[in-house]
C-alpha cells in the first residue's frame, strides 16, 4: 500500500475515533461545557453540551476537503511546488498535513470532555507539540518549494 493510502486510512480512523469518543461521552456531560481556551489552556468560554458536536463536524469537513484536494493535484487553489503536483505526492503531503490536524481535534475534544467531567482543570501543552508537528510538515513543503524555485532559476 502506498504512503498516501496509509495516511488516508490513519486519518479516517482518527475521524471515526473522534466521533465515537464524542458519542460515547455525550450523555454523561454536564449541561455546560468548556468551548474555548486561552493561550495558557485555561477556560475562557463555555456553552451548552450540544456544542461538543462542533469539533467533530469541523474535523469531518476538513477530512472531505483534504480528500477532494488530493484528487485534483492540478488545482490552482493549491500553492505547492510543481514537484508535488503528482497525485501520489500531493496525497502524501495533504494527508501528512491532515494527520496533525486530526490529532489536534482529537486532543482538544478529549481534553475538553475531561475538563467538563472535572478530571483535569485546563488544556495540557500537547496542543503546542501537535502544532509544532504541523509546522514541520508545512516547513518541509516550503523548503522543497524554495529549493525547486532555485533550481528552476538556475536552469533558465
Region annotations inferred by a language model:
Residues 11-13, 46-63, 127-136:
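Alpha-helical transmembrane segments
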Residues 12-22:
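Single-pass alpha-helical transmembrane signal-anchor segments
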